[in-house]
Regions:
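Conserved acetyl-CoA-binding loop-helix of GNAT-fold acetyltransferases
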Residues: 91, 96, 102-115, 127
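Active-site rim helix/loop that mediates acceptor-substrate recognition in acyltransferases
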Residues: 25, 32-78
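Conserved GNAT-family N-acetyltransferase fold
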Residues: 59, 69-71, 89, 94, ...
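Conserved glycine-rich acetyl-CoA-binding loop
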Residues: 66, 97-108, 120, 136-137
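A short beta-loop-alpha structural element at the N-terminal edge
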Residues: 10-24
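A conserved beta-turn-beta hairpin within the catalytic core of GNAT-like acetyltransferases
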Residues: 76-91, 101
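Terminal substrate-recognition subdomain of acyl/acetyltransferases
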Residues: 1-9, 131, 135-180
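Conserved GNAT acetyl-CoA-binding A-motif
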Residues: 114-129, 142
């Protein structure tokens, strides 16, 4: 039942600021704390993308002056073409503080990020993730765009420009995603 006297939670979604790298890193580490590297790999991805100028879209969720979520998008290469030349991007990582999850904050970051990609003239986006979660945004498994070594049902694609030809082949993310 709706309670008109319940407090309203205001969350602002916006571009990251140059001074927020450490705070974003803390959000990422907390969100991925249960992963094998405790979120340090995901944090290094974002820090390196930022340092390399390859962080095409980087959004934060803020509540009461505190960062509670983050999403990053960077150019990918498909079928051996130069990175970014096809205007396709990879979404990774998406992070929301554990105590703020299941409140549509991640969904808001994804939707806002996809809108930002469209404004950049992006043709599509790929990600490795849960098909049940990402289907709500239009992502689906794609047999023609593949990420080698990953079960195809978890590698998802979304065309953002249906007038452009859809590329096919193996996807390569920025080098930081592929540790040696």
């Amino acid at each position: 039942m709706f309670d008109p006297n319940a407090p309203v939670e205001v969350v602002t979604l916006r571009d990251e600021r140059a001074s927020e790298g450490d705070a974003i890193g803390r959000v990422i580490v907390a969100a991925f704390a249960g992963e094998p590297q405790g979120g340090q790999f995901e944090r290094r991805i974002v820090d390196t993308l930022r340092a390399d100028g390859a962080l095409s879209v980087s959004l934060v969720a803020e509540r009461d002056g505190r960062l509670i979520g983050h999403v990053a998008f960077s150019p990918v290469s498909i079928g051996g073409e130069p990175s970014g030349s096809q205007r396709w991007y990879g979404l990774a990582p998406l992070a929301v503080l554990p105590d703020c999850q299941r409140r549509s904050i991640g969904a808001g970051l994804v939707r806002t990020g996809l809108d930002a990609l469209r404004r950049l003239g992006a043709r599509g986006c790929v990600l490795l993730g849960d098909p049940a979660y990402y289907a709500r945004f239009g992502f689906a498994p794609s047999g023609d765009i593949v990420f080698p070594g990953v079960p195809p049902e978890y590698f998802l694609a979304l065309s953002l420009d249906d007038s452009a030809p859809r590329p096919s082949g193996d996807v390569r993310y920025q080098d930081v995603f592929h540790p040696v």
